[in-house]
Amino acid sequence: MASRHNPKLRFGMTLREASSFQPSLAEGPPLPVVNYGLVGKQAPGLLATPSGELPKASAVVITWASAEWAALQHVFCAGRSPMPYSTRSSGTWAGWERYSAHLPSGAPSGWTFWGYYRTVEVGGERVLLFKSNTHLDWPGPTCLTALIKMIIADVNPSVILSIGTAGGAKPQDHIGTVRAVSAGTLFESGQPQSTWPEYKNGWKANDAILGSADFKQLLFPVPMTATDLQALSSEFNQHYRSHYTVGQLDPDGLNLGDPAPLIDDQTGGGASLLTTSTFVVGTTAGTYQNYTSIEMADAVIGQACAASNTAFAFVRNVSDPVQNAALPPTVQGNWGGAVYDACGFYTSYNGAVAAWAMLA
């Protein structure tokens, strides 16, 4: 049975709606070769990965969706050659093991494994990479919490990093912005924001590489052009039988990336992202601007880590910036989903590079 996880749930889409329209860039370039030597480092080393057990590691890096997994694979395992845009939806990669041991009783039918994993060496330390098949929306928060507790018990990491795409919350953030924090807040519908539970810790990333003069050369500006944006809006209007202009869908030009993507490391501080399993979209009016981004897992990870005093941080890339507050919510969600599909591969690359730099 196919996964019932819906990565577009935060856009207000059903799984069927999410699958019915998945646009892409007409001529999306490949991800570049990662020149680790520019910052005086070596490429991650590929280690033998045991099957059927999660090995000990000093750090765990978890990601969630196919395009995020492709970017993680590229940066941590295969950065010596370009990665084609067409591989962004690949469902598997050589060298990864599937983990299905100790599934909890009463788990939903069709959910048969926790995720995929492999080990690499970064900065002289063993790092466990994990592509999760266990999500907040499916099979649900209980299973997601169980996954994190199992990783903590079996791997005994010093820190767990969750990385991947997110919706923009800051009205100034262009597509491709990366914001890293060490706190997550759980959205609770119908409750005032002041009562939403927050889970935080004091882990602070090492910014020696992030702050180096040559680090920006490792980044890849999101290649969405004005022509691409016009084509995407036309395809969007055709699918949804609408007539919105680019100026209405993207009034502030946020879907055109910065020449050098912004990497904002706020780990160790008070900034928090927002976790949701329902429709939540940041807007140009500043809705949810007190948070760094909007995603679908991390506060639950923070809660599980905090219970065992395990350090954690979240490195999230803006795959879909804030939406035009003047548009109907359905249009906001649908447009955000279109941009996410077209560009999440590229935004995830920069997030993965930032996560690597924190560990290297």
Q: Where on the chain are the PLM-derived regions?
A:
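Accessory terminal and edge-of-domain segments that mediate assembly/interaction
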Residues: 1-360
